[in-house]
Amino acid sequence: MSERPSRRGLFPAWLVSAFSLSANGQDWTALREQMVRLQIERRGVRNAAVLRAMREVERHLFVPESLRRSAYEDHPLPIGHGQTISQPYIVAAMTEMLDPKPADRVLEIGTGSGYQAAVLAKLVRHVYTIEVVEPLGRQAQALLERLGFRNVTVRIGDGYEGWPEEAPFDKIMLTAAPPEVPQKLIDQLKPGGRLVAPVGTGWQELVVIDKDLNGRIRRRTEFPVMFVPMVPGKR
């Protein structure tokens, strides 16, 4: 579900125009509230901080203008390059599973539109996020900067390698599905940390991996999901 469909010149036209919607701001606020109540709380997400972040982050700014009216609907949306922004419930559920804390440093694999990073940034000290598709990564970086998210750092690169120079991380989230969780990412998880990821090919399972203080790994499966594959390299 987490497919990943300006400074002028850096921002595409749909993104620039998004910031002229203040006249409809109350409408967007009402739509976010409805999204949280009907799609997220009703499905069992209870973490108050996560719900607050979902209410605060302006999801419609992370989608193309032609799809903005659908931004708060209960499904993923294309954002270009064969990628999508995840369904709101999946964003909230994975964030709650991650159990983010205010002092956490979080690694995200799969920046996409930047929406998941923005939600995490409301909850933790710093988000390090890696995107393999360079145009998407640059676009997300510019938008996050424009929106004032100073605690998000974007890198264009191979998510399979992680971010070793900033490791270890308190939490790691994958928003694309590898066949199996890369050992390099498990190695970059701090003892006492948690990793949440879709795993498998085709239909996948959402997996939670906990590393205890002695470095032992415990793994549990939550529910079936469908994400884009996690591809190596840089595109």
Report the location of each language-model feature:
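Short amphipathic alpha-helical segments with coiled-coil-like heptad repeat character
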Residues: 1-3, 62-64, 193-194
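N-terminal secretory signal peptides and thylakoid transit peptides that target proteins
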Residues: 2-14
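Class I SAM-dependent transferase core
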Residues: 24-107, 118, 123, 138, ...
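Conserved nucleotide-cofactor-binding alpha/beta core module
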Residues: 99-218
